[in-house]
Design a protein with these regions (language model features):
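Alpha-helix N-cap and loop-to-helix initiation/capping positions
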Residues: 44-47, 78-85
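Helix-loop elements that line ligand-binding/catalytic pockets
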Residues: 206
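A short acidic (Asp/Glu
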Residues: 43-44, 74-77, 185
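Alpha-helix C-cap/termination motif
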Residues: 55-58, 97, 200
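Divalent-metal (Mg2+/Mn2+/Ca2+)-assisted nucleotide/phosphate chemistry catalytic cores
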Residues: 81-196
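Conserved small/polar residues in nucleotide/adenosyl-binding loops
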Residues: 197-203
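Flexible loop/turn segments at secondary-structure boundaries
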Residues: 38-40, 71-74, 114-116, 180
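N-terminal catalytic cores of NTP/NDP-binding nucleotidyl/phosphoryl-transfer enzymes
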Residues: 2-71, 172-176
Length: 206
């Protein structure tokens, strides 16, 4: 285990046994993490990348989502400014921290239509009441902000599309404050018998 595990900074998980089994048997598995391009990199980002590096050292491929659409929707950061912040404040530092460029994909939500389409289709499995209860949306919340969590669901699921590596376990290291979103994503996927290109999202019975 990494120092983050041994010191108790990583203290919760779901289905980690599936990931560890993949690593031990040299089977494919991946990591999906992201960044909001609206400010400077901080210690929390560093700990997430240290986790990603640890998984990568055990065979994982890493996908890094630049949440430029979410930054635009929730914080009013233009796509051009978000791109500049991401490249100067985050991506360059991630490379300096030692992520293997041959096993790392960095992408922008705004330029990966598969993510947007997945978010749209998976959005049929939730509703405004549920999103409002989780995220506190109210009548004056702009609709781009409401859509942002569904784009994040697309971020998490899309590495399992054939063109991005196919079906395999995906680890999503997040802070405990993000757990409601992870639970939402798992719930949506578990009840979505939807074929998307060659990816069939599992139902609860599968």
């Amino acid at each position: 285990p990494s120092i983050l595990h041994t010191r108790g900074l990583v203290f919760a998980q779901r289905d980690m046994d599936v990931v560890l089994q993949a690593a031990r048997s040299n089977q494919p598995f991946g990591v999906l993490t992201g960044l909001m391009p609206s400010g400077r990199m901080h210690l929390g980002h560093t700990m997430v990348i240290e986790q990603a590096k640890w998984y990568q050292s055990h065979g994982a491929d890493v996908s890094v989502a630049v949440a430029d659409l979410e930054s635009l929707a929730t914080r009013g950061v233009s796509l051009d400014k978000g791109r500049k912040i991401a490249l100067e404040q985050y991506v360059s530092n991630y490379a300096a921290m030692g992520l293997d460029p041959d096993k790392t994909q960095v992408y922008f939500q705004s330029t990966r239509p598969e993510v947007q389409r997945l978010g749209f289709r998976l959005g049929r499995r939730t509703n405004l009441s549920e999103l409002g209860a989780i995220y506190g949306f109210e009548g004056d919340t702009n609709l781009a902000h409401v859509q942002a969590p569904l784009v994040q669901v697309g971020d998490i699921v899309h590495p399992m599309l054939d063109e991005y590596g196919g079906i395999r376990p995906i680890v999503v290291p997040v802070g405990v404050d993000q757990d409601p979103h992870i639970r939402l994503t798992r719930d949506i996927v578990s009840k979505t018998p939807v074929s998307y290109t060659h990816l069939t999202l599992p139902t609860k019975s599968s």
